[in-house]
């Protein structure tokens, strides 16, 4: 890629405005997930499981697969941004496509997990804990799906227009968003699955 007006540069005025808007958005996201976590942990401590113990329902091998898929996707996303900074478009796209595929694996297993719980009679309607459980995980899953769609749109832009100073900052921003979702999942894994099994065990 030539070093002219198409050079990757995240310091454009538009890029700076996009970053500012993203940090404002991320602050709102922290507040959203913080509220959902606080609600779930309060209900978790109260033991309102409606007779459905998490130790009987949670499948740790499945949760570990989901966790590894999302954590590895964070790594592949980081590699993609590394190659973006090196202006190596094909390698950037390869690693970002891997990120999307791993994200789809995560979402697929989460849908399977929800379907399994519903088949066992566990729905948001049976109790306040399970309602908060489905809302928290469903919100995170929806955000992951949004991130996947966002990445795909940017990859289409890069494929059609090339990597340039306008889409490069957007790729960097979506990578931050993806890492944020990974951090949220680590908290979910710890608070919902690990601590949850202790409280209901």
Curated annotation (Swiss-Prot):
GO annotation, cellular component aspect: plasma membrane
A Pfam family of this chain: COX3
Protein encoded by which gene: qoxC
GO terms classed as biological process: aerobic electron transport chain; ATP synthesis coupled electron transport
Function: Catalyzes quinol oxidation with the concomitant reduction of oxygen to water.
Listed name of the protein: Probable quinol oxidase subunit 3
E.C. designation(s): 1.10.3.-
InterPro entries hit by this protein: Cyt_c/ubiquinol_Oxase_su3, Cyt_c_oxidase-like_su3, Cyt_c_oxidase_su3-like_sf, Cyt_c_oxidase_su3_a-hlx, QoxC, Ubiquinol_oxase_su3_dom
Cell location: Cell membrane
Membrane topology: Multi-pass membrane protein
Alphabetically ordered keywords of this record: Cell membrane, Membrane, Oxidoreductase, Transmembrane, Transmembrane helix
Ribosomal protein among keywords: no
GO molecular function, one term: cytochrome-c oxidase activity
